[in-house]
Structures are given as C-alpha cells and as structure tokens.
C-alpha cells in the first residue's frame, strides 16, 4: 500500500465516524503549494464555509502560500467566517494527514480565533 492509499483509507474511517455522529466538520486538504479548509455540514451535503491560500487576500498577506505561516492565516480566516455564519463548534477532519506542520498551524490558529473542536 503506498502513502496516498494509506492516507485515503485513514480519511475514510474518520469521515464515516463523523458522519454517524452528525457533527459539522472542518476538513483540511493540502498540496505542496496551497492549503484548503472547508466547513462541511453534518450530513455531508453542503459546504458552509471555505478558505484557502488560492484567494487573493490570503496571497497578499503571505510571501509563499505553501508554508506554516500561510496555513495559520487560512485558519484565522476560516474561524472568522464561521463566526459570521454562527458556527462555533466543529469536529476536525484532518483527511488522514499527520497532525503536524501546516495542518497543526491551521487548527491552532482557528482555535485561537474562537473556533471550538
């Protein structure tokens, strides 16, 4: 089993558990150049809030979009947008990635700005 297949199988297990519980989830996806975050409804049918390093306002704030600092900026933005929509608590879906580096920076920044996990 290669790395990608192992990550995808880990993410499937997490998503099945979260869907059974019906929690709104913060889903993180990363590429070498960008970080994406989405808040998805409990039944998995709609994206409620989204933010990424592809957006112009995020690109203006950071020098390079594929590092820890830019992931922290995305975390701040996603937390602020959740507050505007009235979402205060989410379950964290790390999509099979390790809780380290950019994923960790995004979540910690979201926590600091008032999003509860």
Curated annotation (Swiss-Prot):
Cell inner membrane keyword on record: no
SUPFAM superfamilies: Translational machinery components
Key words of the record: Ribonucleoprotein, Ribosomal protein, RNA-binding, rRNA-binding
Record's GO cellular component terms: cytosolic large ribosomal subunit
Pfam families the UniProt entry points to: Ribosomal_L18p
Stored CDD domains: Ribosomal_L18_L5e
InterPro entries: Ribosomal_uL18_bac-type (IPR004389), Ribosomal_uL18_bac/euk (IPR005484)
Biological process terms in GO annotation: translation
Disulphide bond pairs: none
Keyword Zinc-finger applies: no
Molecular-function GO terms, alphabetical: 5S rRNA binding; structural constituent of ribosome
Gene3D superfamilies registered for this protein in UniProt: 3.30.420.100
Subunit structure: Part of the 50S ribosomal subunit; part of the 5S rRNA/L5/L18/L25 subcomplex. Contacts the 5S and 23S rRNAs.
NCBIfam families found in the cross-reference section: L18_bact
Function of the protein: This is one of the proteins that bind and probably mediate the attachment of the 5S RNA into the large ribosomal subunit, where it forms part of the central protuberance.
HAMAP family xrefs: Ribosomal_uL18_B
Protein family according to the UniProt entry: Belongs to the universal ribosomal protein uL18 family.
The protein's name: Large ribosomal subunit protein uL18
Gene: rplR
